[in-house]
Design a protein with these regions (language model features):
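P-loop NTPase motor domains
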Residues: 1-128, 132-135
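Conserved ATP-driven motor cores of ASCE-family P-loop NTPases powering translocation/secretion/packaging/pilus
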Residues: 110-111, 118-191
Length: 191
């Protein structure tokens, strides 16, 4: 930590903020995830498993945990692959996917690159690439307008339920190649 912080003006604030964030990942339910004994990868990625993050406090921590799990899944699939274009043998469901795959600006700030945008792009690419290893994904969300466009474009089958918001209807309707009348009907679907 000392060797990575080179600027002196905000060094104390930066260090304190970073240490506080790291400590929060080692307390309570987060501590059980990051510090306790690991579940074997085979059990986590080959069997039926539910990862319930409802008790994780902040959305940022949920996103971090979900992102790390998707990347670990990608590593596991790549290392255990017997070839390319494998048949579907496992499905991962990402519920409330906007927590992980949120639409971000492509703009770069004066401080440097868009870190959040790059991480969403990296995860979206990982999800797309895992199909060749037999991994399928169900991306579920009630607010498609919050999700990154690449996620919507890279899904083949779309199941659309009632969408009261016009912007969501337009977005999903265009992605599913619906006509104007069909897009209008999305607001009238039963709940």
């Amino acid at each position: 930590l000392r060797s990575t912080i080179t600027f002196s003006e905000n060094k104390g604030a930066y260090k304190g903020s970073l240490l506080t964030r790291l400590q929060s990942l080692c307390n309570g339910i987060n501590g059980m995830i990051f510090v306790a004994d690991e579940i074997p990868k085979e059990q986590l990625f080959e069997e039926n498993v539910i990862v319930d993050l409802s008790r994780v406090g902040s959305s940022e921590t949920k996103s971090l945990i979900m992102g790390m799990m998707v990347l670990k899944l990608q590593e596991y699939r790549m290392s255990s692959a017997t070839g390319m274009n494998a048949e579907l043998n496992h499905i991962t469901v990402l519920e409330e996917a906007h927590n992980l795959l949120r639409r971000t600006s492509n703009e770069q700030s004066a401080e440097g690159s868009n870190l959040l945008g790059k991480s969403v792009e990296m995860l979206s690419n990982a999800i797309a690439e895992m199909r060749t290893y037999g991994e399928g994904f169900i991306i579920a969300d009630q607010a498609p307008g919050l999700m990154d466009m690449s996620v919507i474009r890279n899904t083949n089958t779309k199941i659309i339920l009632r969408l009261p918001d016009q912007a969501d209807r337009e977005l999903v309707g265009r992605a599913a190649n619906l006509n104007e009348d069909q897009i209008t009907e999305l607001a009238k679907l039963p709940c």
